[in-house]
């Protein structure tokens, strides 16, 4: 039996994360559109169902990859409200968990979120993606570097998730 992780969002980034980790982990996937990567083990359209299922699994790592859109506002700034909404929902659920944001966000955003969610059990870590939309799955599977930013011990837990799947890639 494999350890499991959860992936929120199944667009080209979330679908790539799902496919890229599927040989190493069971994947609990959530997307409100109902479209999922064929590599997902369990699929949910409701975040609360995803969390309930994930948290009840004996081998769940406590890691949620958040791969959601951050569209550009007219001001040129990223609109992080979709990501923040999901993080807020995750913070309202009991237990210790790590949210790994793969979305484009401005510098300092994870620090702001970690302050906001302090004491809830949720820690936010950033893991930028280096994917091209046309080859996203292959780009994810063939990474030449992995960058993780965030407080310990959460960033260490994310590092272990990547090390298991990509043991030869520098982190």
Please describe what each predicted stretch is.
Residues 53-54, 112-125, 136-171:
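Internal alpha-helical scaffold of NAD(P)-dependent oxidoreductase catalytic cores
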Residues 62-63, 98:
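Structural motif
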